[in-house]
């Protein structure tokens, strides 16, 4: 199938969702050669990935992931397996790759939102092109990444937050590692991670590195069963809602997807230059995260509050972003968000 798919994609013909599922099954089962994988994902990138193609690839990756069971259900290809009355599960995983050298905003947000009573299954990885991925900063904060799936499940159930370390849960991705590394360009695999949460997160705030991906990935999430959420991109390239200017937002609701622009001023927040939002290496970013969770003021706190506000709206904990920002600020200042970090560190290290 992959040889036929390469020939079609080279001619700029789109694949159906079913065809993409067949191709990705071949890739992730080890049935495609490295040359075929590299050719296919390069041709797909040059053509431009469609909503159906991304959806099909995400379904296969979800189906082959090691599941993290939260409650009684896990998100997979078959939507009938899902208990729609279960507790909301949030993921704040983004694509990364923004090149803006920002600190770990979505990881900081995860602790705040979980302290507000939302179950958070934070999916993430080590840095690929940046200085510090979510796994890197969590490790620097003292979180033990080398834990079994049952420890992650217990973490989410008992304290309301767990970290889903992508390499440990997506073993089938090993077949694409070599081709991806050797061609050295962004491909469909750079956007699949946030679409394939092994705990079946049904609520997401997903930051993307390109504006043209905002509405597209929102449509994909909708097809995959996301009940509510936001896909976002800052005008400065940040894969977050930024403080430097406008951000593009695609809102996912029961009625569909709505695209619009927002600015910090809409929520009473002062703009900040990108330099004030910069991070560093894992140890430096760990200091930033602790400072924010300890109540330190400044631009870094404001951008975390803004993004947390959207996450709290997505999960139904706030009726609008302004209320979400207020709730996030109160949660930090009460010490509850820092307590979540301390509890995650303790639980994951007790498991050793």
UniProtKB/Swiss-Prot annotation:
The kind of enzyme this is, by top-level EC class, is transferase
Function of this protein? Catalyzes the transfer of the phosphoribosyl group of 5-phosphorylribose-1-pyrophosphate (PRPP) to anthranilate to yield N-(5'-phosphoribosyl)-anthranilate (PRA).
Where Mg(2+) 1 is bound, by residue? Answer: 106, 240
- Where does this protein hold anthranilate 2? 180
- Where do the annotations place 5-phospho-alpha-D-ribose 1-diphosphate binding? 94, 97-98, 102, 104-107, 122-130, 134
* Family, similarity comment: Belongs to the anthranilate phosphoribosyltransferase family.
Q: What is this protein called?
A: Anthranilate phosphoribosyltransferase
Residues binding anthranilate 1 = 94, 125
HAMAP family named in the record: TrpD (MF_00211)
Subunit structure of this entry? Answer: Homodimer.
Residues the record lists as binding Mg(2+) 2: 239-240
Q: How is the cofactor bound?
A: Binds 2 magnesium ions per monomer.
Q: Name one GO molecular function term.
A: anthranilate phosphoribosyltransferase activity
Where does this protein come from, organism-wise? Citrifermentans bemidjiense (strain ATCC BAA-1014 / DSM 16622 / JCM 12645 / Bem) (Geobacter bemidjiensis)
Q: Which EC number(s) does UniProt give? A: 2.4.2.18
GO cellular component terms listed in the entry, alphabetical order: cytosol
Q: Which GO terms describe its biological process?
A: L-tryptophan biosynthetic process
Determine if rRNA-binding is one of this entry's keywords.
Answer: no
């Amino acid at each position: 199938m992959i040889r036929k798919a390469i020939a079609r994609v080279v001619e700029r013909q789109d694949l159906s969702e079913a065809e993409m599922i067949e191709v990705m099954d071949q890739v992730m089962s080890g049935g495609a050669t490295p040359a075929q994988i590299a050719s296919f994902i390069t041709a797909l990138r040059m053509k431009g990935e469609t909503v159906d193609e991304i959806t099909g690839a995400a379904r296969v990756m979800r189906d082959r992931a090691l599941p993290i069971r939260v409650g009684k259900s896990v998100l997979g290809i078959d939507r009938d397996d899902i208990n729609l009355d279960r507790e909301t599960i949030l993921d704040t995983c983004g694509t990364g790759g923004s090149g803006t050298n920002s600190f770990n905003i979505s990881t900081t947000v995860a602790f705040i939102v979980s302290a507000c009573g939302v179950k958070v299954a934070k999916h993430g990885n080590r840095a690929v092109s940046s200085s510090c991925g979510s796994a890197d900063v969590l490790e620097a904060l003292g979180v033990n990444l080398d834990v079994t799936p049952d420890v992650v499940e217990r973490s989410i159930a008992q304290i309301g937050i767990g970290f889903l370390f992508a390499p440990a849960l997506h073993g089938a991705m090993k077949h694409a590692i070599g081709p991806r590394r050797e061609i050295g360009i962004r491909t469909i695999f750079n956007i699949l991670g946030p679409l394939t949460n092994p705990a079946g997160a049904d609520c997401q705030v997903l930051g993307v590195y390109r504006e043209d991906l905002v509405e597209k990935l929102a449509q994909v999430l909708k097809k995959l069963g996301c009940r509510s959420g936001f896909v976002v991109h800052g005008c400065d390239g940040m894969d977050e809602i930024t403080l430097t200017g406008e951000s593009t937002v695609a809102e996912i609701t029961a009625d569909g997807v709505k695209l619009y622009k927002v600015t910090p001023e809409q929520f009473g927040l002062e703009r900040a230059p990108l330099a004030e939002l910069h991070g560093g290496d894992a140890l430096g970013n760990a200091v930033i995260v602790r400072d924010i969770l300890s109540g330190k003021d400044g631009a870094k706190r404001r951008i975390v509050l803004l993004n947390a506000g959207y996450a709290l709206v997505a999960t139904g904990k706030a009726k609008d972003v302004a209320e979400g920002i207020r709730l996030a600020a109160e949660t930090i200042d009460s010490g509850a968000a820092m307590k979540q970090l301390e509890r995650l560190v303790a639980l994951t290290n007790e498991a050793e």
